[in-house]
């Protein structure tokens, strides 16, 4: 699955919340579920 993450000018903290997740971690999501993250 592909995930496109668009970051605008707002500082809502969504990116940091995603990266700091404990269970499942961002690394676990990418490796275990085969997710392709495309960040902008």
From Swiss-Prot:
Catalysed reaction equations from the record: 2 Fe(III)-[cytochrome c3] + H2 = 2 Fe(II)-[cytochrome c3] + 2 H(+)
Cofactor(s) needed by this chain: Fe cation
GO molecular function, one term: cytochrome-c3 hydrogenase activity
EC number: 1.12.2.1
Keywords: Iron, Oxidoreductase
SUPFAM superfamilies xref list: HydA/Nqo6-like
Group of enzyme by EC: oxidoreductase
Protein name, as recorded: Cytochrome c3 hydrogenase small chain
Organism encoding this protein: Acidithiobacillus ferrooxidans (Thiobacillus ferrooxidans)
Gene (name only): hoxK
């Amino acid at each position: 699955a592909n995930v496109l993450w668009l970051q605008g000018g707002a500082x809502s903290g969504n990116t940091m919340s995603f990266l700091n997740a404990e269970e499942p971690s961002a690394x676990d999501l990418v490796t275990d579920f085969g997710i392709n993250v495309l960040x902008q």
